């Protein structure tokens, strides 16, 4: 047989076939995760005042107040009625003149002492009398003797209410009350559309998930055959090779080998025909790699899938 011809030039790409039918849409994906809570809304208007609750329990009595200042001393009592005159004594014997003068001096001294004692007591009582018009003393005088208990006075008028006491301690929380009867269903209210709220914050970035592949579309009509390529560069002839089974008999198999070469009964095996020379594809040059894929439409397949597409078996292979 003659030498294999040169590899022809790559033919022009055929026209693209008609697009297949659109596959059925895939099943809807699962619902996405729940978004973050929105901002807090505006505070609503205050409701109507509720009914007045029952009065609470009375608070603990307040602490006793501070003792007030001591009052002014009372006015002196009225002078008592003069007592009855005593009985007249018997007339004594007439004494000597010297003794009479001595008795007079003693009597005068006793009278002066009595009068001075009464005057000092009277002055002391006068000093205790308050005098709002001519009193210049800032310090109260000494307390006077206790007067006789007076008669019970009339019942006084009720005094003004005292100042409010300090707030008592909060009471212990009572047990929860029984559940009330269900109220009647109110009439249906007529609501009006409120103002539009501010836009919420942007949600988290969604995850792109590949859906299930759609059904395969119908096969388009085959394109016109490409033009025949030019003959390629002639490759170097390969060495003729064949396998002699007698040379493989001495190779150990599972740890065991033949002690001497194996010779079949019919003699050594020789091939009936000449060895078939397998053509070897020459290495691609830089110009061939630059021109590869130039005649194909752009963006038909991603760059990382171009060689994968070339490795797929074509129709009829």
Curated annotation (Swiss-Prot):
Q: Which GO terms describe its cellular component?
A: collagen trimer; collagen type XII trimer; collagen-containing extracellular matrix; extracellular space
Where in this protein does the record put region Triple-helical region (COL2) with 1 imperfection?
1-97
What is the recorded post-translational modification? The triple-helical tail is stabilized by disulfide bonds at each end.
Record region (Disordered): 1-99, 130-317
Q: Where is the composition biased (Basic and acidic residues)?
A: 271-287
Question: Compositional bias (Pro residues) at which positions?
Answer: 27-36, 52-61, 140-149
- PANTHER family membership: COLLAGEN ALPHA, COLLAGEN ALPHA-1(XVIII) CHAIN
- What is the protein's given name? Collagen alpha-1(XII) chain
Mind giving the lineage of the organism this protein is from? Answer: Eukaryota, Metazoa, Chordata, Craniata, Vertebrata
The gene name on file is Col12a1
């Amino acid at each position: 047989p003659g030498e294999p011809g040169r590899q022809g030039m790559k033919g022009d790409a055929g026209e693209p076939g008609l697009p297949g039918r659109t596959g059925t849409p895939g099943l809807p994906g699962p619902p996405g995760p729940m978004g973050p809570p929105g901002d807090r809304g505006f505070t609503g208007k205050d409701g109507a005042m509720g009914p007045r609750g029952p009065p609470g329990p009375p608070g603990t009595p307040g602490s006793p107040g501070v003792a007030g200042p001591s009052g002014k001393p009372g006015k002196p009592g009225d002078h008592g009625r003069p007592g009855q005159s005593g009985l007249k004594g018997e007339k004594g014997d007439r004494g000597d003149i010297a003794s009479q003068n001595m008795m007079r001096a003693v009597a005068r001294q006793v009278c002066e002492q009595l009068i001075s004692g009464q005057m000092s007591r009277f002055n002391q009582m006068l000093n205790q009398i308050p005098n709002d018009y001519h009193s210049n003393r800032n310090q109260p005088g000494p307390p006077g003797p206790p007067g006789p208990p007076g008669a019970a006075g009339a019942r006084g008028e009720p005094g003004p209410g005292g100042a409010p006491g300090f707030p008592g301690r909060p009471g212990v929380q009572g047990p929860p009350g029984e559940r009330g009867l269900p109220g009647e269903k109110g009439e249906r209210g007529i609501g009006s559309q409120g103002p539009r709220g501010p836009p919420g914050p942007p949600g988290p970035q969604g995850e792109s998930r590949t859906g299930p592949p759609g059904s395969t579309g119908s096969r388009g009509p085959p394109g016109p055959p490409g033009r025949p390529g030019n003959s390629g560069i002639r490759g170097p002839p390969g060495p003729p090779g064949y396998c002699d089974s007698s040379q493989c008999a001495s190779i150990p198999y599972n740890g065991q080998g033949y002690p001497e070469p194996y010779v079949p009964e019919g003699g050594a095996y020789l091939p009936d025909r000449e060895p078939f020379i397998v053509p070897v594809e020459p290495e691609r040059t830089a110009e061939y790699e630059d021109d590869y894929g130039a005649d194909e439409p752009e963006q038909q397949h991603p760059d990382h899938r171009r060689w994968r597409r070339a490795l797929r078996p074509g129709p009829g292979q």
